[in-house]
Regions:
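C-terminal helical subdomain
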Residues: 124, 191, 209-244, 249-253
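Conserved glycine-rich Rossmann-like NAD(P)H-binding loop of the short-chain dehydrogenase/reductase
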Residues: 35-51
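Short, small/polar-rich loop/turn modules that mediate ligand/substrate recognition or access, typified
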Residues: 142, 183-188, 244-246
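Canonical Rossmann dinucleotide-binding motif of NAD(H)/NADP(H)-dependent dehydrogenases/reductases
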Residues: 3-40
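Hydrophobic structural elements of the Rossmann-like NAD(P)H-binding subdomain
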Residues: 13, 92, 146, 189-192, ...
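Short C-terminal tail/terminal secondary-structure segment
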Residues: 245-270
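Catalytic loop of short-chain dehydrogenase/reductase
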Residues: 15-25, 96-183, 193-199, 216, ...
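Conserved mid-core segment of classical short-chain dehydrogenase/reductases
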Residues: 56-57, 63-74, 78-118, 135, ...
Length: 270
């Protein structure tokens, strides 16, 4: 169902890999709501995914870019404005990876070069996106930038490893840059802290299936799915949320405010 919430708006969507990706769902919903946008991912990620299929489905163009490269980002924003015919109204940052998680390194024994890579790709890339956008005046007033995060930024989930540190930095960048970008250009910057979601990236975390089951039982409304997250992103890109900025917005069925549930307690008696 379309309400034309994004009619006439132009955007850039980072991080769609395949139809399991939240970014993929956001692109589909943004298209349904009347937006035009470009799609981007790192060249190495594009070889692993099916971005061409999404581009065809949403009538979008793909611009490969390494989000850790300022030069790539300058080219991305420049080309996107040329393709879309004007400044950008919304950006989705859905980027995250950890070599330490992939290689199953213990948090107390991290490979520090991999650690720096995790922080650069998963968090500092947002700072670079915002820096390039602000310096080139690429985003319209009242534009919206949304980055996806996870509650492990604030609480311990052992197997989430150094990605938890990256998400903490991501949320801090959102607040800090959100202040400056709001003051100078009235651009809003927020993070959405999503329920554990079955994606290619999430599935790489040890014990992920068990944790999804736990989270489902710990959330009064149950886990929020990827489509529901996409719908929340659409609302954040729309004019209905013009005065929301510098926030970490939980989209998790109530998990973040729940100490314990009867469903979880009952399992201790089994």
């Amino acid at each position: 169902m379309s309400n034309n919430l994004l009619k006439g708006k132009k955007g850039i969507i980072f991080g769609a890999l395949n139809d399991m990706s939240i970014a993929w769902k956001v692109a589909e919903r943004a298209h349904e709501e009347g937006a035009t946008f470009t799609l981007t991912n790192a060249p190495i990620a594009m070889r692993m995914g099916a971005l061409n299929e999404l581009a065809e489905k949403t009538n979008s163009q793909i611009i490969p870019a390494d989000a850790t490269s300022v030069e790539d980002l300058k080219n991305l924003f420049s080309q996107s404005q040329e393709i879309l015919g004007g400044k950008i109204d919304f950006v989705l940052h859905s980027i995250g990876m950890s070599p330490n998680v992939r290689k199953k390194k213990d948090y107390t024994d991290l490979n520090y070069e991999w650690y720096k890579k995790t922080l650069d790709v998963s968090a500092m890339s947002l700072h670079k996106v915002l820096k390039v956008a602000s310096e080139t005046d690429a985003i319209n007033e009242w534009g919206s930038v949304v980055a996806l995060t996870y509650i492990a930024a604030q609480r311990i989930f052992p197997d989430y490893n150094d990605m938890a540190d990256a998400k903490s930095l991501l949320e801090s960048i959102t607040r800090s840059f959100g202040y400056h970008y709001g003051t100078s250009n009235k651009v809003r910057v927020n993070t959405i802290s999503q329920s554990p979601t079955v994606t290619t990236a999430g599935s790489g975390v040890s014990g992920f299936d068990k944790f999804i089951d736990f989270s489902e039982n710990m959330s009064p409304l149950g886990n929020a799915g990827s489509l529901d997250c996409a719908n929340y992103c659409i609302s954040m890109f729309s004019d209905l949320t013009k005065y929301v900025t510098m926030q970490n917005l939980f989209h998790d069925g109530g998990f973040s405010s729940t100490g314990v549930t009867n469903a979880v307690m009952d399992r201790f008696g089994e």
